[in-house]
Amino acid sequence: MEEYQLYLELDRSRQQDFLYPLVFHEYVYGLAYSHDLNRSIFVENIGYDNKYSLLIVKRLITRMYRQNHLIISANDSNKNRFLRYNKNFDSQIISGGFAIVVEILFSLQLSSSLEEAEIIKSYKNLRSIHSIFPFFEDKVTYLNYISDIQVPYPIHLEILVQILRYWVKDAPFFHLLRLFLYDYCNWNSIIIPKKSIYTFSKNNTRFFFFLYNFYVCEYESIFFFLRTQSSHLRLKSFRFFFERIFFYAKKGHLVEVFVKDFFSTLTFFKDPFIHYVRYQGKSILASKNLPILMNKWKYYFIHLWQCYFDVWSQPGTIHINQLSEYSFHFLGYFLKGGLKHSVVRGQMLQKGFLIKIIIKKLDIIVPIIPIIRLLAKAKFCNVLGNPLSKPSWADLSDFDIIARFLRICRNLSHYYNGSSKKKSLYRIKYILRLSCIKTLACKHKSTVRAFLKRLGSEELLEEFFTEEEEILSLIFPRTPSTLRRLHRNRIWYLDIFFSNDNDLINHD
């Protein structure tokens, strides 16, 4: 944020009126592609492969200035094209500029809203994706039904631009944005093919992610608005971070549309006990009441996507299941619901009796098969989980080889330490440990047995199992009973903000 504010010396009260000129400033593209504006390498033409030079950006901005974008005609579309020379390359540069401009605006609004609400510290903890699992563990005893929802995508980009205009007031900026998308994505057709969306998202990753996140934020804001209206209790776990133009008027109109089919029924089934969790393109809706209320929310989502976003969604894509009999994959874990039966023996005077207690539980398990496939793809083992050596690392020093394996092992252990069953995690560590030994033996042109015999012991590789224990001992008292309890219990880390399979096995 400090870097953005350094380049954008705008009055906060009028920032929304000055987005259009920012698109024609060179430093915006420098921020978009992480270039230092004071370095000479940004001024030089550094070759065809690394094309993001200041000279090319200047030429593109000059061409955008000279073209007349006020009129779009179907007859002379080739004469007045927004992207003429290298369509994919020009779109990457321009979309990066668009993305950084809107990100700056929304970041400033979000930070100011958080400062006013004084929830910055708790917000940072809630950003961690691992905060979802303790939430599930705390609430699972009260929940009966769960709905697994896949957020439909893609939608027509024109709809996104129209919705975005309710947040930002700068009309020229949106005219330029619409013209760019019109030229690049072929808006002459009513339906944009998935191939075009894939090409656009691949070449313009940053801008595509912003549009997708904005789309999800928009439909969730409507969902939480109606959720608040249909509840006796005030909703405390959600806050609108951004000031919205015509917000309540638009939501009020949406309520009137569904008043016959949806809202009047919800008025009868008043229940505040609904929990909603989302990460990436997957959402989970859970409730304690009968499935009839869940069915109402299910059809609400379908009508919302179809009527408000023009996205077709089949009712069969949203499933309602009983939590005690349901299992699903979420954020790299395998979550399995069930019932835990306990028998307590009691005695009153001379009479003894047994009390049978049934408690709902949620097992959070490490999915061993997908992780083995991931390790096999990276050549640490085969598809059966048998460790392999890494000949490509044989040129490194012994210290670097061990450090790389330790870093990968630490990443996996850090992420999956919240598992209720640690046996699968220990197996993953075992695979990496033997792969490290085989790599060292391959480097020294020896067998594994001879290499270990020459070392005399395996103390060199004990760090695979002792490093995590040393870290935990800095936080908790180092007693045998405490360490045994830590190995058995789940530990969630609140410093994990995203999940990516490639990052888990990344040695950098």
Curated annotation (Swiss-Prot):
Major subcellular location class: plastid
Query: Where's it found, cell-wise?
Result: Plastid, Chloroplast
Taxonomy, superkingdom: Eukaryota
GO molecular function terms listed in the Swiss-Prot or TrEMBL record: RNA binding
A GO term from the CC aspect: chloroplast
**Does this UniProt record's set of keywords contain Transmembrane helix?**
no
Keywords in alphabetical order: Chloroplast, mRNA processing, Plastid, RNA-binding, tRNA processing
Signal peptide position in this chain? none
Matches recorded under InterPro entries:
Domain_X, Maturase_MatK, Maturase_MatK_N
Q: Which residues form a coiled coil?
A: none
Q: Does the keyword RNA-binding apply?
A: yes
Any GO BP: mRNA processing
The function of this protein is:
Usually encoded in the trnK tRNA gene intron. Probably assists in splicing its own and other chloroplast group II introns.
Please state which protein family the record places this protein in.
Answer: Belongs to the intron maturase 2 family. MatK subfamily.
Q: What is this protein called?
A: Maturase K
What is the species of this protein? Coronilla varia (Crown vetch)
At the highest ranks, the source species' classification is: Eukaryota, Viridiplantae, Streptophyta, Embryophyta, Tracheophyta
